[in-house]
Design a protein with these regions (language model features):
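Boundary at the C-terminal end of the N-terminal hydrophobic targeting segment
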Residues: 17-25
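Bacterial N-terminal signal peptides
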Residues: 5-16
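PEST-like low-complexity, intrinsically disordered acidic/proline/serine-rich tracts
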Residues: 25-338
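Preference for short coil/turn "hinge" residues that link or interrupt alpha-helices
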Residues: 11-12, 20, 73, 78
Length: 338
């Protein structure tokens, strides 16, 4: 373990991966390092918490480090409140150092206050609570199989080849730094169904409501087949109508989209002609969902484009009220936390 201070001799090797919105390919995820010092900045904002600290080095001096935390909802589930950790606190931070030793920008896993011993993980890793199965898709779900250590989730999709000349030109010009999310332009439907954080499905007689954690996003699916109103204003979520087939598959059809940056896929925009069909099939045990979406858009696609994924059921929890996305924070990782 790299020695950054005297307390680094007590460093703990950790095999768990850090998974959040941005790629973790820049960090050494095979073990944690301990950083000891005084916080100079605590930014409680979305999509990520950020910290700066003057960290003790092995030469008897200090270096300024930046640390990227998780999102607010994960921190709250881990036991944090905004006022718990402040600038001026002396702390021990467990985190993943940068692969480039010259870059003083690390991924925070846990921060401990030396004055009180209070410890705050980036996310709650220890809760063991009973998970109740779902009978009708209701409940709280998270995406499975998402591991952004390699950065593959943040590249242009390799399987997207059915592109018009306009779509191909956009893919050829792809650069991840142009991701609209880094400017707080949210991920549109249906791409958003395979994003990070949790989803809560709530059923009533006429609608299915899908709440998206972290983004304050609330979709309403009209299960009664209600037609799109004449005065409906197109947006990134569109107008959705749903039904449950005889085999139990939930079908959601959506139109009424506005033109959206990267609305088809990473690197490919969408037009007002975009249409989508989502399919959800509940596992027999009620603890998993097989999901997919198919997009058509004649402006950018020559044929339908389908993406598949999986959800797992988790114990229900409250989605905390969160501040809106901060563009300065959303792009801060591009500047190594500066």
């Amino acid at each position: 373990m790299k020695q950054l201070s005297l307390l680094a001799l007590l460093g703990i090797a950790v095999s768990s991966a850090a998974v959040a919105h941005h790629s973790r390919a820049a960090f050494k995820l095979d073990k944690t390092v301990q950083f000891v010092g005084t916080l100079t900045e605590v930014t409680w904002a979305n999509p990520h918490l950020f910290f700066k600290a003057m960290v003790d080095n092995d030469k008897g001096g200090q270096d300024e480090w930046s640390f990227e935390g998780g999102n607010i909802s994960s921190a709250v589930r881990g036991g944090w409140q905004k006022e718990d950790v402040r600038a001026g606190d002396h702390v021990v931070i467990e985190g993943y150092a940068n692969l480039n030793p010259k870059i003083k920008y690390a991924l925070l896993e846990r921060v401990t206050l030396t004055a009180t011993g209070a410890s705050y993980p980036r996310r709650d890793m220890t809760r063991e609570v009973k998970v109740e199965p779902s009978k009708d898709f209701s409940g709280t779900w998270v995406l499975t199989g998402r591991d952004n250590r390699t950065g593959e989730h943040f590249s242009a999709p390799k399987d997207l080849t059915q592109l018009t000349a306009l779509g191909k030109a956009q893919i050829d010009a792809f650069d991840t730094v142009n991701d609209p999310y880094f400017r707080c332009i949210m991920i549109s439907t249906p791409r958003v169904i395979f994003g990070a954080a949790g989803y809560r499905f709530t059923r009533d007689a006429k609608t299915l409501r899908i709440d998206k954690e972290q983004s304050n996003r609330h979709r309403v699916i009209h299960m009664d087949g209600a037609p799109m109103p004449a005065n409906f204003k197109p947006d990134m979520d569109g107008w959705s109508v749903g039904r449950v087939e005889k085999d139990g598959t939930l079908i959601i059809e959506t139109s009424g989209f506005e033109p959206t940056p990267w609305g088809v896929a990473r690197g490919v925009d969408s037009s007002a002609q975009k249409r989508s069909i989502e399919r959800y099939k509940l596992d027999p045990d009620g603890l998993g969902i097989s999901a997919s979406y198919t997009i058509t858009d004649p402006v950018y696609l020559t044929a339908p484009y389908t993406v598949v994924g999986r959800y797992k059921k988790v114990a229900d929890y409250e989605f905390p009220a969160e501040p809106p996305c901060d563009p300065e924070v959303a792009s801060r990782h591009l500047r190594n936390g500066k």
